[in-house]
């Protein structure tokens, strides 16, 4: 045995024993009678280390010794002793000459890194990039690649990698389905053109996103898809949420009670929502009449009686919820199928506690939900004849500013920006948004906490920007050099280089002051300009060309209704004629009322199919399993004196 080989083996043994020296020794039992049975030794890490020692002592075969030591490292991983396995592999790897052994050792090392920590993906990526071949370990390599892609939220690439793993087929099918559902329709369509092996999943995901809100067409498309992929695990084990959706009936909102504050301090907000609901109601009536007339004309031309499947007219009634107790509101809605509202959180909490379970509620605000909120399965049971109990069906729709902040954080991360700083006005709403942004940002492993600056007024704003961008320090250094130099010094302030994005939570007036200050504070010597992002609170439809110039290069999110070139131009023209001086806040509440009414028939299916979205005036809306509605807003950017739309996330 060479001296170096002996040292390697001794160190490997030491690594193995170092973590077991403190373990409790088992009491030896006296064997009274020798057994004639021959039992197979347990092939644990100790077994493989013993084999390595004994085999090498006899044969001096380095290859076989290394094989046993690698199996010992593998066994240590199985025994949940990854620290010990890593130490052994780091000692052993310099001695490995066979490429298969190198690949095996690197795989065990990478797997142990991920078992021990969520912050080692960079190490694992380097290990996988340096593999010289798969050598029969393709399934394990694919599993590691899938984990890397999940960490980067690259769901399509994760699904591609998962196909080559050796996990159970049904579990693999279900996992791929869950991951691909995180893609939007555009991403799915693009993937369908290139990823032939994922066709069953991609096609079904596209069918759900395109047709799930049109039950007859959805059923037809689903049957066609099943016939194209007979025998595929996704067909034989159709996703549970789709099975539930097929058994559900849409909400039949025959009589709707709307609870809004139509008097008192919230009267303006309540009236704006009411007008949005009425606009949607009247639009539905016109659409129904046009459809009915077309059906009648078709029937007359063919001489056949054609049954009409058009939506029946709904009865809708508005009640003033101001200064009313939950008991009074409950009495008002006793003869109605669906309740839309109330708007005030306290009233929502009190009303949901006493509202009969046969009433469907779409509250116009979001409240803290209890843990016993009914699940999708319970709601499904309640819609079947076998159910012996009723479950309350409640939904919650709000224009929550925190949702915008969370979307903004994810958007910036998708842009591969890693060090934003945040400026927020000194008021409760913008500070809540800043807190939500930072909390979402830090959910990503190893994310650097953004610096947060709160400003109180315009003067304070200028000081805070100068301090946060280190411009004040740069000015101070220039003055010091001027004092020391005997000649005239020409200096240009430089801003800090460690940030790559600026986030603003402020109103349009504050943003119009902030943006030029930030622009003036940025050094012309910088390699690239800093991106400036904001929420919908920084934009107003009343901004003229001069005001927009102050916001140039600002990227922000807002509901489609507030942006140019949306799909509801006739409705926008009517509202402008009726309310030419309406404030932005009331315009947004009008859009909320419009969407709330139109969402009613589809709420149940949206809740069952969490990946499904409904596009409305307020954004792309989905419903989570607790009945809470969430919005995704489109992105826009101010280019000189106009607003241009950007691609959705």
Question: What would you call each of these model-derived segments?
Answer:
Residues 250-272, 420-422:
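Short beta-strand segments enriched in small/hydrophobic residues
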Residues 8-16:
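Bacterial N-terminal signal peptides
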Residues 377-382, 391, 399, 474-476, ...:
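Extracellular/periplasmic periplasmic-binding protein-like sensory domains
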Residues 377-383, 393-509:
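Extracellular/periplasmic Venus flytrap/periplasmic-binding protein
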Residues 536, 578-645:
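Segments of small-molecule ligand-sensing domains
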Residues 16-36:
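Bacterial Sec signal peptide processing site at the extreme N-terminus
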Residues 34-242:
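Alpha-helical protein-protein interaction scaffolds
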Residues 271-272, 287-299, 303-385:
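Beta-alpha junction/loop-to-helix N-cap segments that form part of ligand/metal-binding clefts
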């Amino acid at each position: 045995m060479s001296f170096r080989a002996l040292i390697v083996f001794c160190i490997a043994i030491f690594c193995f024993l170092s973590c077991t020296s403190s373990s409790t020794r088992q009491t030896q039992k006296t064997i009274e009678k020798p057994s004639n049975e021959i039992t197979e030794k347990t092939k644990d890490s100790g077994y493989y280390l013993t084999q390595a020692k004994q085999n090498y002592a006899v044969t001096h075969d380095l290859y076989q010794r290394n094989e046993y030591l690698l199996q010992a490292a593998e066994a240590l991983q199985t025994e949940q002793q990854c620290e010990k396995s890593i130490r052994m592999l780091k000692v052993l790897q310099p001695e490995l000459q066979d490429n298969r052994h190198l690949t095996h050792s690197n795989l065990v090392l990478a797997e142990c890194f991920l078992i021990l920590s969520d912050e080692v993906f960079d190490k694992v990526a380097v290990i996988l990039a340096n593999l010289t071949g798969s050598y029969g370990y393709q399934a394990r390599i694919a599993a590691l690649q899938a984990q890397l892609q999940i960490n980067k939220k690259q769901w399509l690439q994760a699904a591609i990698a998962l196909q080559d793993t050796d996990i159970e087929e049904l579990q693999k099918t279900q996992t791929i389905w869950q991951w691909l559902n995180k893609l939007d329709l555009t991403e799915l369509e693009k993937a369908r053109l290139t990823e032939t092996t994922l066709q069953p999943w991609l096609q079904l995901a596209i069918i759900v996103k395109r047709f799930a809100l049109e039950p007859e067409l959805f059923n037809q498309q689903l049957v066609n898809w099943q016939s194209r992929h007979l025998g595929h695990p996704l067909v034989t084990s159709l996703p549970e949420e789709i099975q539930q959706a097929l058994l559900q009936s849409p909400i039949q909102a025959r009589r709707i009670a709307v609870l809004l504050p139509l008097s008192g301090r919230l009267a303006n907000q309540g009236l704006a929502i009411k007008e949005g609901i009425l606009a949607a109601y009247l639009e539905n009536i016109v659409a129904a009449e046009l459809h009915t007339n077309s059906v009648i004309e078709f029937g007359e031309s063919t001489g056949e009686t054609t049954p009409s499947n058009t939506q029946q007219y709904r009865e809708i009634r508005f009640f003033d919820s101001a200064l009313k107790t939950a008991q009074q509101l409950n009495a008002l809605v006793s003869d109605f199928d669906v309740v839309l509202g109330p708007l005030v959180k306290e009233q929502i909490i009190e009303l949901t506690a006493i509202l009969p379970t046969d009433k469907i509620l779409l509250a116009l605000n979001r409240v803290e939900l209890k843990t016993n909120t009914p699940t999708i399965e319970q709601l499904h049971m309640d819609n079947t004849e076998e159910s012996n109990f009723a479950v309350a069906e409640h939904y919650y729709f709000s224009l929550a500013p925190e949702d915008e902040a969370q979307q903004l954080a994810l958007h910036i991360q998708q842009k591969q920006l890693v060090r934003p700083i945040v400026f927020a006005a000194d008021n409760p709403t913008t500070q809540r948004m800043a807190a939500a942004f930072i909390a979402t940002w830090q959910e990503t492993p190893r994310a650097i906490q953004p610096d947060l600056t709160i400003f109180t007024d315009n003067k304070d704003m200028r000081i805070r920007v100068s301090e946060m961008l280190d411009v004040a320090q740069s000015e101070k250094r220039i003055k010091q050099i001027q004092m020391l130099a005997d000649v005239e010094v020409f200096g240009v302030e430089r801003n800090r280089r460690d940030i790559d994005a600026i986030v603003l939570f402020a109103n349009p007036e504050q943003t119009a002051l902030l943006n030029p200050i930030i622009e003036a504070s940025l050094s012309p010597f910088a390699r690239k300009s800093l991106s400036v992002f904001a929420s919908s609170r920084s934009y107003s439809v009343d901004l003229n060309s001069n005001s927009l110039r102050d916001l140039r290069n600002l990227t922000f999110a807002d509901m489609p209704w507030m942006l140019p070139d949306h799909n509801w131009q006739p409705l926008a023209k009517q509202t402008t004629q009726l309310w030419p001086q309406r404030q932005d806040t009331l315009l947004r509440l009008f859009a909320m009322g419009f969407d709330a009414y139109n969402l009613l028939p589809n709420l149940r299916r949206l809740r069952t199919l969490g990946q499904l979205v409904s596009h409305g005036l307020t954004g792309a809306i989905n419903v989570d399993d607790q009945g809470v509605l969430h919005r995704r807003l489109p992105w826009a950017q101010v280019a000189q004196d106009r607003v241009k739309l950007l691609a959705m996330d």
